[in-house]
Amino acid sequence: VTWRSAPGTTRLTLETPVRAVFSTDFSSVKYRGYVFAPELALERSGLGLPRSRARIGLGPVFASGGLMDYWYRVEERYSRPGRPAYDAASGYLGLRLQFSYRVPLTERISVSAGGRLENFSGASNAGSPLFRSELNATLVGGLSFALYRSPAQTGSAAEPFD
């Protein structure tokens, strides 16, 4: 679901992604479960620098029982003093705030920066001995480069966010 401002410089979106989660030890791949992370996001183009795009989003995160087991379950055979057996449950994982800022430097090169703040207070598995912290912060930076651009291009009436 998306709302756009009249001049097309701002949009508000509600995203409802469901993602499958897999792990690998490079000899096999295993399905671990899924994550449902709805997010309400505000995006703005041309904020600060021409052609830039700023985005901030907020939403809860929920995970399946299989995925929660992968992260938080402690089987009886691995329990020890200070780390009792624990059977994880599906449900609320936490609240996520994400933000990013992207600036195209040329037609082929863009620079971006962003981050994520996560609050796991009230998570369904906060009682697990493997649950370490209620807060998590991540910062990222990146440089993207288009290796090839087709000389055949079509006209487009797309908005800056498309």
For the regions a protein language model found, what residue spans apply to each?
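Short N-terminal helix-initiation segments at or just after the protein's N-terminus
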Residues: 1-4, 84-89, 139
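Internal, conserved structured core segments that host functional sites
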Residues: 1-28, 133
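Transmembrane beta-barrel domains of outer membrane proteins
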Residues: 2-4, 19-21, 41-45, 98-102, ...
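Repeated loop/turn-to-beta-strand initiation elements of outer-membrane beta-barrel proteins
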Residues: 6-14, 47-50, 108-111, 148-154
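Broad gene-expression machinery/nucleic-acid interaction feature
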Residues: 13, 35-37, 138
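Transmembrane beta-strands of outer-membrane beta-barrel proteins
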Residues: 13-19, 55-61, 114-116, 142, ...
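Outer-membrane beta-barrel transmembrane domain signature
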Residues: 25-112, 116-125, 130, 161
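Outer-membrane beta-barrel "beta-signal"
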Residues: 134-162
